[in-house]
Amino acid sequence: MSQKLPPLKIYTSQLPLVSHKNMLENEEEASHSQLFTPCPVPPSFPKASKPNSNQPYPNGPVCIYPPNIYLYAKPTMPIIQSFDVVINVAKEVLHPFRTDGRHYRDSKHNLDIQVFDHIEYVHIHWDHDTQFALELDKLVSFVAYNAMQLNKKVLINCQMGISRSACLMIAFIMKTLNLNVSDAYEYVKERSPWIGPNMSLIFQLSEYQQIIRKNSSQGPYQSSSLKQSKRKSEGNLLFPEKPHSAQLPLVSPSTSESSMFTNLRRTRSSGSISNDAS
């Protein structure tokens, strides 16, 4: 004769509390992870473990001015070897090569250049307090000459790719596309949401804007590189047909504007920058 077991008592206080809202959120998160997978990274770039908001450029250099002008943080050797010209504007960042390479002086742009195999490496010793407004024009000209006339792939970097290198990239966009600081900042920010120069650097860009206007009083600026590219490609100024070497993937993650830039007011007419906050 079978023995009857006592009824099993379950105390609800011992069970984890799972609300209907949490169940829906978990289901939504699971379905989201199935639908969206990270884009593959080319073998020339080290894969980031988990991209997060504190890690800029998780997928490698970002193309700011197609097809061959890129912005990045401190590059590794495999990344450097993917470019023809590297411009490092961080004083504290040293090149990763084992030797000092071959040196020569670029008299056209007044720059000292190191050459490693096919790579031209320019080290500009800026820190976050450097007054660089007067240096920007020769660097912008150097970038335009190599990328747009010689059709080389150019990387601009600093330690984090946020401040100093971003300033040089913004300066290039200002002069090349004839934009004021606000619009050039927005152009770069849309392509690299991690940038965020401090106000001291922004004011130096504003000073550079006045230099551009002073030097181009006879109308909108066009560099000699742009003019030659125009003659060669019959009006296709911005996008040469064949890059010098293989293209990197375009990465344009979307994010909200930084709190610093929301305080900047567009001034298309005057070109100056002002703070909304008192």
UniProtKB/Swiss-Prot annotation:
Chain spans, region Disordered = 217-278
Please give the Gene Ontology molecular function terms for this protein: MAP kinase tyrosine phosphatase activity; MAP kinase tyrosine/serine/threonine phosphatase activity; protein tyrosine/threonine phosphatase activity
Q: Where is the composition biased (Polar residues)?
A: 252-278
Q: Which PANTHER family match?
A: DUAL SPECIFICITY PROTEIN PHOSPHATASE, DUAL SPECIFICITY PROTEIN PHOSPHATASE MPK3
Which family does the entry's similarity section mention?
A: Belongs to the protein-tyrosine phosphatase family. Non-receptor class dual specificity subfamily.
Q: Which organism is it from?
A: Schizosaccharomyces pombe (strain 972 / ATCC 24843) (Fission yeast)
Q: Which InterPro entries match?
A: Dual-sp_phosphatase_cat-dom, Prot-tyrosine_phosphatase-like, Tyr_Pase_dom, TYR_PHOSPHATASE_DUAL_dom
- What SMART domains does the record point to? DSPc (SM00195)
Write down any Gene Ontology CC term.
cytoplasm
Q: Taxonomically, which superkingdom?
A: Eukaryota
> Can you give the residue ranges of the Tyrosine-protein phosphatase domain?
60-214
**Enzyme Commission code:** 3.1.3.48
Primary enzyme class: hydrolase
- UniProt lists the gene as pmp1
What does UniProt list as catalytic? C158 (phosphocysteine intermediate)
- Catalytic activity annotated for this protein? O-phospho-L-tyrosyl-[protein] + H2O = L-tyrosyl-[protein] + phosphate
The name this protein goes by in its record:
Tyrosine-protein phosphatase pmp1
